[in-house]
């Protein structure tokens, strides 16, 4: 039986971050730290379980590059945006983020946290310099369908016609 030569790659030759199966809290943070950070930035602690910024940073280091677009469809307190901005400031990256949040705190907590992280927050010895950047905030209109699955007539005939035209043109 003929033997085939194989390329052997050693861990010491690898570049970048090598993932480990366990992330200790001193590397990745914990929920108490996440709650403290949220309180420092927007003076809010009512969110049940904010994610630690450092754990999101570690995920981004492993699964993205410096020009990635990061989507967080359950943005909560805005931790993902905070992590993206912090990582960009650290490594000179140009990552961008898209956050989606449907709860009523989207503007008062999520967007406000992002604004403060970009512009700076705190006072005196507790002042934290802004990380820079910018973002756009959008509000989606009324839902086309009501919870009972009927059409929401208050959106107007034009929106309903556009929806019908769109769905009828899908093959």
Regions found by a protein language model. Give the residues of each.
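A glycine-rich phosphate-binding loop feature that marks nucleotide/adenosyl-phosphate handling sites
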Residues: 5, 11, 76-77, 130-136, ...
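Residue-level detector of flexible, active-site-proximal loop/helix-junction positions
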Residues: 29-30, 104, 144
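A structural signal for well-ordered alpha-helical scaffolds and beta->alpha junctions
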Residues: 16, 107, 111, 153-157
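Conserved S-adenosyl-L-methionine
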Residues: 49, 56-125
């Amino acid at each position: 039986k003929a033997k085939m030569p194989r390329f052997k790659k050693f861990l010491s030759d690898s570049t970048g971050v090598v993932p480990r199966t366990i992330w200790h809290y001193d590397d990745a943070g914990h929920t108490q730290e996440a709650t403290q950070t949220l309180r420092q930035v927007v003076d809010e602690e009512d969110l049940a379980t904010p994610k630690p910024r450092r754990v999101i940073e570690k995920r981004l280091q492993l699964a993205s590059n410096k020009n990635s677009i990061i989507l967080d469809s359950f943005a909560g307190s805005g931790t993902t945006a905070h992590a993206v901005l912090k990582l960009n400031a650290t490594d000179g990256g140009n990552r961008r983020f898209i956050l989606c949040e449907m709860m009523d705190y989207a503007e008062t907590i999520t967007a406000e946290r992002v604004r403060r992280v970009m512009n700076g927050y705190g006072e005196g010895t507790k002042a934290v310099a802004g990380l820079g950047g910018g973002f756009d905030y959008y509000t989606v209109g009324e839902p086309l369908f009501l919870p009972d699955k009927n059409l929401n007539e208050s959106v107007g005939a034009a929106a309903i016609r556009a929806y019908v035209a769109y769905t009828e043109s899908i093959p």
